[in-house]
């Protein structure tokens, strides 16, 4: 397994909405992805992270750079695949591993 990966994500935060609203929003984004919508475009439209303007691209990162729940999910993904919703202290993430 590589020491570094590259991934993009979509964050639906729990600072600006309730946890239930965030769950509903992330489920809608998952549905849009399953309908064939582009991950980067959905990140630009819906992500609460500044990386959203870059299609959710987080660049390359190694272990220890992200919160544990995010890191585990990202490193467990196959290249080209997208996670289910991952809950962290920031909210709900969809992670797409690109490298």
How does the language model describe each region?
Residues 74-78:
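Soluble sensory domains of the PAS superfamily and closely related sensory modules
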Residues 1-34, 50-65, 95-99:
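Well-structured core secondary-structure elements of compact alpha/beta domains
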Residues 6-14, 39-47, 70-73, 84-99:
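FKBP-type peptidyl-prolyl cis-trans isomerase
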């Amino acid at each position: 397994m590589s020491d570094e990966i590259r991934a993009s994500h979509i964050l639906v935060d729990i600072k600006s909405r309730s946890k239930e609203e965030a769950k509903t929003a992330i489920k809608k984004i998952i549905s849009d992805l399953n309908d064939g919508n582009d991950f980067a475009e959905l990140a630009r439209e819906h992500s609460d992270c500044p990386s959203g303007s870059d299609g959710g691209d987080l660049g390359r990162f190694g272990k220890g750079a992200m919160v544990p729940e995010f890191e585990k999910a990202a490193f467990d993904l196959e290249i080209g695949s997208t996670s289910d919703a991952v809950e962290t202290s920031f909210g709900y993430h969809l992670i797409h591993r690109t490298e």
